[in-house]
Swiss-Prot record:
HAMAP family: Bpt
Catalytic activity: N-terminal L-glutamyl-[protein] + L-leucyl-tRNA(Leu) = N-terminal L-leucyl-L-glutamyl-[protein] + tRNA(Leu) + H(+); N-terminal L-aspartyl-[protein] + L-leucyl-tRNA(Leu) = N-terminal L-leucyl-L-aspartyl-[protein] + tRNA(Leu) + H(+)
UniProt keyword Transport present: no
Pfam families listed in its UniProt record: ATE_C (PF04377), ATE_N (PF04376)
Enzyme class: transferase
UniProt protein name: Aspartate/glutamate leucyltransferase
Gene name in the database record: bpt
Organism the protein comes from: Sphingopyxis alaskensis (strain DSM 13593 / LMG 18877 / RB2256)
Molecular function per GO: arginyl-tRNA--protein transferase activity; leucyl-tRNA--protein transferase activity
EC number: 2.3.2.29
GO BP, one annotated term: ubiquitin-dependent protein catabolic process via the N-end rule pathway
Keywords, alphabetical: Acyltransferase, Cytoplasm, Transferase
Record family assignment: Belongs to the R-transferase family. Bpt subfamily.
Localization (cell): Cytoplasm
């Protein structure tokens, strides 16, 4: 007999400076993912715009701002652009492995390099090895660390050039956090490749969506998500197709991923 479903208790954080939009404040509503129903709860909350961080599911709940918009790629209809096709070909030799969610020194070293290059002043800049281990290993759901390695003769472990902490949900893959070698001279577009690879693998597995988190109006750091089509956004009336404006498309073209 299955355990009875317990309706979760939700809490709201105190206002804090927004890490994405200068001069704004943010609040989050959150709940704990625990017990036998953690997977079902995470799936249900994911469909209404929540994200997972360790054993907590959260979403923005800002009083005077609605810039954060949940977005997901429709995997079976994914139509890569010409530049995305080139990126897929360029990196198609990478060896992809879905690893158990155990943090390694090699992954952490890659993360430190990525943060120093792309987000030196971001909220994760001071993340130490224990913080990283907590991010990866404290999961009550079906999570994997997807590793991207360069091929080597003989089939051994090649150089690690990319990672993505990924949850498998009932209706798709949720990309929790990805990082990669941002200075590899021969691997341009690794961030784009990791997302596109997730979308193609989801489609092959019969999973309809890949959840990318929040597209944030006015944030250049999140503009790249608009490059993956077709894209759906979550609004007051549910999920609908997201058609970026011409200016948003231009911003997406130039933001690195």
């Amino acid at each position: 007999m299955s355990a009875p479903f317990r309706f979760p208790r939700f809490f709201v954080t105190s206002p804090a400076p927004c890490p994405y939009l200068a001069g704004r404040t943010e609040r989050k509503v959150f709940t704990e993912l625990s017990g036998n129903n953690a997977t079902e709860l995470n799936d249900a909350l994911g469909r209404i715009g929540f994200r997972r961080s360790q054993s907590v599911a959260y979403r923005p709940s800002c009083a005077d701002c609605s810039a954060c918009v949940s977005v997901r790629v429709c995997a079976s209809e994914f139509a890569p652009s010409n530049s995305q096709k080139r990126t897929l070909r360029r990196n198609g030799d990478l060896v992809v492995t879905a690893c158990k969610p155990w943090a390694t020194e090699e992954q952490y070293a890659l993360l430190r390099s990525y943060l120093a290059s792309r987000h030196p002043d971001g909220g994760m800049a001071d993340m130490d090895e224990q913080d990283f281990a907590d991010m990866v290993e404290q999961t009550p759901v079906d999570s994997y660390m997807i590793e991207y390695r360069e091929p080597v003769a003989g089939g051994g472990k090649g150089r690690l050039v990319g990672c993505c902490l990924t949850d498998r949900q009932g209706d798709g893959l949720s990309m929790i956090y990805s990082f990669f070698d941002a200075h590899h001279p021969l691997r341009e577009g690794l961030g784009t490749y990791i997302i596109a690879d997730h979308v193609l693998r989801a489609a092959k597995a019969g999973l309809p969506y890949v959840y990318l988190g929040y597209w944030i109006e006015g944030s250049a750091r999140m503009a790249y998500k608009a490059r993956f089509r077709p894209l759906e956004k979550l609004g007051p009336d549910g999920w609908s197709r997201f058609e970026p404006t011409p200016s948003e498309r231009i911003a997406a073209m130039f933001e690195l991923a």
